[in-house]
Amino acid sequence: MSSIPTPPDANGNPLIALAVAVIYAILYVLQGVKYGVSLLTIGIPSCIVRMLQYSLTISLGFPHLLALFAGALLALFFLIRYRYLTRYAQLKESALPPPSPPALASRLLPLDGDGLGLPDSRSQTSSFHNYLDDFLSAIRIFGYLEKPVFHELSRHLQTRRLAAGDTLEIGGGEFWCVVEGKVQVFAPDASSQGTPTPSSDTNSPTRPSFNGYHLLNEVSTGGTLSSLFSILSLFTEDIKLSWKSSADDEGEEEQIFEGAPEQSSAKLRVRRANSDVSQLGPDSIGVRAMDPTPLPESIDSHGDSSVPQRRRERSSSIDAAGETVREREGIFASASLPISSTEPPSPRRSQSLRSSPRLNSATNLLSSQSEHLRSSVPRKAGIEIGSKALKGTIARATEDTTLAVIPAAAFRKLTRKFPKASGTIVQVVLERFSRVTFMTAHKYLGLTREILQTESSLNLLVTHPLPRSFYTGGGMQALRARFQPEALAKESVHYDSLKSSPNARVSSKDYFNYVPASPTVKAPSLPAMTPKPLSPIIHKSSLGQTATTTVKNEPLNGGSSPLDETRDKVPSFGLSTAAATNPDASFRHASPFIRRTSAMRQQVAAGDLAMSVHNLPDESGQAYYRPTAITPGLSKMDTWQRRYSSSWNLNDSPHTDGQPVDPQRDDESLLNESFDLKEAVLNSIAKSIGLYQEAESNSDMIARSSMAPSVSALSTPNSPMFPPNAGTPLQGSTRSRPPHFGNVLDLINASSQNEGVIGGMLREAAFNSRPDDEASSISMSLHDSQGGASGVDRKIMKDLERHVEILFFKKGSVLVKEGERSPGMYYVIDGFLETSLPFRSTSSNQENPNSTPGSKHRQSSFGSSNERPFKTALGLDTSKGKELDDGSKKDEALFTVKPGGIAGYLSSLCCTDSYVDITAKTDCFVGFLPHHTLERIIERRPIVLLTLAKRLLSLLSPLVLHIDAALDWQQLNAGQVLYEKGDKSTDFYIVINGRLRAFTEKNDNMHVLREYGQNDSIGELDVITAVDRSETVHAIRDSELVRIPAALFDAISIKHPETTVQFMRLIAGRVRRALGDEMNGRVPGLPTTDMNLKTVCVLGSTRNVPVTQFAGKLKNALEEIGASTSYLDQGIVMRHLGRHAFARIGKLKVAGWLADQEQHYRTVLYVADSPPASQWTLTCIRQADLVLVVSMGDDPSLGEYEKLLLATKTTARKELILLHDERTVAPGSTRQWLSNRPWIQTHYHVELPGVVTPARPIPPVHDAAAIAAFKHLREQVETRIKKYRGLRPFTRPRRPPHMNDFARIARRLCGQQIGLVLGGGGARGISHIGMLQALEEFGIPIDAIGGCSIGSFVGGLYARETDLLETAGRTKQFSGRMGSMWRILSDVTYPFVSYTTGHEFNRGIYKAFYNTHIEDFWIPFFANSTNITHSRMEVHRTGYAWRYVRASMTLAGLLPPLSDNGNLLVDGGYMDNTPIQPLRENGIRDIIVVDVGSVDDTSPRDYGDSVSGWWIFFNRFNPFYERRVLSMTEISSRLTYVSSVKTLEGVKATPGCHYIAMPVQQFDTLGGFKRFSEVMEIGLKAGRETLKKWKEEGKLPTGLVDEAKGSKAVQRGNRLRRMSI
């Protein structure tokens, strides 16, 4: 069947058709099977047989084979060239977007408060005003109040309703607050007689005059109307101003000054001895008679010493306090009115509180600087001291208003019922007054003299000289003899010129040859043994006696202020005439006292006049002193006798050796035979500060109200408030008995770094002996309260005596500098201390854009000032050198502290920075009471603060009190808006605590302008220029502000033009900085520096992160650079505040204590070491100016703590810390972290040995057999080699201090970062490596690097792992590639875009960086380039490093532009060859700029109008041809610098910019790559010379907050390791 026949016709029958179809289908299948079988069995085999029978012959000659081989090589070349060698082109990732600005809390999602237990403080306030909430917000000014105290005040709460336009006098002792409505506060104008009710009529178009009243403030709902000082007077009714001597001594003083009526100041002292009444008349302070009108009748004549007369004086002097409105006519006016010109007082009581003050036309101006010698107040009507000055203050309702008032009777009752709580309220009020009113008047209102007149008056008031017998009996000669031999011993080593001086020896026949040293008087470096007495001695019984005769003092030579002339008339027992007239004595004064080196000294004396502040061992190399970071004063003095513990605990306070001194154990037979100078000095200080209070008829009232101790008698060492191992000088070996100062003082010493005052609103809680005992905080010791002060005083004095130091200061030494925290109180034994107001330059605070007047000093006030007594006591203070000599000519002398006076009284007790400089006018011997000891006195004896409050009440001018009444203390919650853009500018603000951010919104984008930290001012420019708000300001965290009304500023400016001058300086500085930013090309809208960071939260991403270890190392790094730091974790806070610290009842306690920590430390670290949902973790986040998110780099996903951080909606700046075990980062690993966290502002890589990051399981990949065999062979070879290498211990190399990562973070927190900018210049940039080596040799840390062109290449290599050797090696490899002519020729192409393809250039850069990202670099790095698509400069901080380094090095014409997401990038030098602005925007203050592109060749070039390249080419071989034509590369290079020359000039003029031009201009841009070693050597030499020059000139940046303290960190650390066991 060869073929299938045609099927028959079915004739229309379907069945037949179907059968035919089936049959034919089977036939077709069978036919296909036949065909397939025949093909497989016959067709294919036959075809194969035929193919094998054919034969093919190919014949190729050599040319053909050569061409074929060349073609194969060419194909292989193109395959490798464009497939293998261009793999770098595949490394393309777009740069990460810039970090999102901190969003406002209102933009975030609602807070899940139910799940986290967080109240959303940023929710909109309800329209329903809660009466109680407004009242509570008002009384928060008093700090934390216990329940009984709060209930006591609430019982007396009253309300007053005022209709719109109604007035109310509020100048009494009541406490007023606005519950609802708005009230205007008016004060009577001293220049016109005021009517009782102010009206709104204006008499002048320039100044609103409300019928003789000033508008001070406008208070809305929740604000307070009362001045705090009007309330202080209620608590100080029974306090006397000064110590009163015995009646016999009074009579002696009266006889002494009987014939000297012109000495008004002296008579005032006599009257103050006769009475505790404040003599507030102008005669007591020397006011010139300006008008024949009679003086107020309270100015009395010299009265007798009888008690009735004292009572009359006490009652009659009230009116003078309020009716004498003092006149301002100068700084210090001389005394001119004799006492006899006054009239005797009339024995009448004071007027009622509601009466208006009578204004005398003769004394209607503001107070004079010299008119502040005030004394005490009456016993009953004491409220009129503070209120008299404020009397007549009127509140007028602008709308229907409801006021809440606590009457004066409530505070009186509170004083008697809860004396301890009253003392706490006084302390809070004083603290707020010093931090708010004093700071505002001093820094912003230019009223420093108004405060200084109070200080000068206080100085006169607290003068209590030593007994005259001390001076007449040879005590001063003996004191000098004790100091002098030690100075001569040192002089024999250091001062060879004085070695042979005959006057340098002290006569052996001095007082101390006969009188042995008291065992409790341990002067510095005294001999260990003192001979027995050979002659009669002075007994201690003469301590309290007053001299019967006086030594009249001659004025000092030189300029003395008018006050000095007045004070010369004050009797002083402290000046030795021998010291003033004897040349030998003057020589002894001038000799520097330096601690001798003795073979008996086995360790450092704790009080060796602080010679050891230099941290250098003595000449024998045996001892040195290591001060702690916050030491406020001097150490405990001893004579190195073997009576202390042999172990020297370096963690203890330098004021103690860890064991108290027992006077009974040393020379008991001589105890009563020697004059105890320390005890005498301490007694005088105790009288001056009010620690001694005499018992009178109302002693029981005093004991109940003011002398009650502030520590409960229930305190026991077993209390939870006792931290373990809290060895203090007050406990020592007697731990079993209760300490003298109670458990709170142990808490103060619980940490060696905690020397601050436990104050603020938390004082009450810190004193709880049992945190769960609610009544313990307001209880008191019955024995102490009823038994008077004698026993308590004796115990306190016995303990405090050990802390008194006797110091010698050379003439010209600076004891305290303006703007620094006072180290303590100085009692002048002999000599004079001068208080002067330093000249404030308007350019002194231009450095910090956020700085306010005086804030520049404040940065160093936390560290350096505490150690100043150590240096200045020996004249070794380096800070007084040339700067002091130049500035002393401009300083304005204010007053002189004479023997018996106290310097630093106000600043020490108020815990404020000093407003003046205190210098030694002559060689001085002073008694020094350290600041921490004063704090303990304050804690134990509130009478000291009450006395200060009483004195301030009587001495402060009405202007300061009116300012205090007008200032408003305001509190903002986190996220709350202070004011919005477009609001009316009615007030400006000062930040007390917290942080705020200013921003503007444009096109739905938020642009952060700046951030405000502690002591920064907000909005004053808008107020002065009378424009609407130009920005929106909101609180980053809970913040405390001072609101200064514009009305107050206007009122003060009229009377005090210096206030306007002060503000004009402030505004001029702001405008000047703004113009400077504009001239320097600063990009608008970018945030300014944020150096003023106070609180830092250390938050781990997960529970496994070692935040405690990280924070501990960070704290040590902060203190090593000189920044005092408070370390707070949950355990420390609970030990201080009790177990209820984080409960709702303890919220105010925690807030007050944390605010106090911020006030006393440069930086506060909040360590979140508790579970995520705990209250402490939430507190850490809420309190932070900056949040450091610490992670170990194991999992880039968000951790539980980070989720909590986002849920709290905090708007604080957030930065990421990635911990690594070694100094290397896996390429690309950082990008995953940053991409998941767009809210991170910046990140840091930190090396923390011991961090174990578990390796992720890698999916198994089956290698080919050949690769597996090769790996097996490699392992075998490595195993065999290890046998011959031996066992070596694994030692991790210790990083040098300038490469410490924790120090880098610390410098960032303190705003002390050092940046490095490396400029472009082709091959000349090889010299950058030499500069880097010079920086390492000088130990200069580098915290950030920026580069342009070749500078980005070298800087990027160094920033990668900070390895100088690797940087030099890879740069040399790149130079070899660029110097190879063959590589350049192989890359040449048709010059349409450029002469080369750029491939070889790309390969050279890629071989140096490979696939590393910029964010993987160990040090923050950026490179700049020029975007020719959009004609702008680009700054690259993320992305593949090789690409953006290549973009920054793209020289147009030689290389094609780099395409990055459609943008064409070329060399950054076309825009800015030394880009410093990106570093400035990151808050880096000191920037070292290395410029290698400067072209100094400006010689004229003349070569005609046309140039033949061939002619120049052939003339290259002509030795006599001088080429004057620039090559293309040189022209292109110069073209780069033409565009950036203006920017370079701005860089040179930028403050904080250290510019160096490398002398490498003789090298070509490309040809210099062949001379690598030569260029690098030139850079190293130039770098060394420049850094050495800067160091000699004092311009070398070190990154230290405190130069003196931080420079010794390395030496201290090394020596401690060598001397440890």
From Swiss-Prot:
Catalysed reaction, written as an equation: a 1-acyl-sn-glycero-3-phosphocholine + H2O = sn-glycerol 3-phosphocholine + a fatty acid + H(+)
Membrane topology: Multi-pass membrane protein
Binding-site residues for a nucleoside 3',5'-cyclic phosphate 2, renumbered to this chain: 951-1070
Gene Ontology CC terms, in alphabetical order: endoplasmic reticulum; endoplasmic reticulum membrane
SUPFAM superfamilies listed in its UniProt record: cAMP-binding domain-like, FabD/lysophospholipase-like
Keyword Magnesium included in the entry's annotation: no
A GO MF label: lysophospholipase activity
Active site: 1349, 1467
Location(s) in or outside the cell: Endoplasmic reticulum membrane
Documented EC number(s): 3.1.1.5
Domain PNPLA: 1316-1480
Residue ranges of the motif GXSXG: 1347-1351
Region annotation Disordered: where it falls in the sequence: 188-209, 250-379, 545-566, 648-667, 711-735, 772-791, 839-870
Annotated transmembrane regions: 13-33, 60-80
KW Transmembrane (keyword) present: yes
All ranges on the Cytoplasmic side of the membrane: 1-12, 81-1621
Signal sequence bounds: none
Activity regulation (record text): Inhibited by organophosphorus esters.
Superkingdom of the source species: Eukaryota
Cited InterPro entries: Acyl_Trfase/lysoPLipase (IPR016035), cNMP-bd_dom (IPR000595), cNMP-bd_dom_sf (IPR018490), LysoPLipase_patatin_CS (IPR001423), NTE (IPR050301), NTE1_P-loop_dom (IPR056556), PNPLA_dom (IPR002641), RmlC-like_jellyroll (IPR014710)
Residue ranges of the motif DGA/G: 1467-1469
GO annotation, biological process: lipid catabolic process; phosphatidylcholine metabolic process
Bias type Low complexity, positions: 195-209, 348-361
Name the record gives this protein: Lysophospholipase NTE1
Organism the protein comes from: Cryptococcus neoformans var. neoformans serotype D (strain JEC21 / ATCC MYA-565)
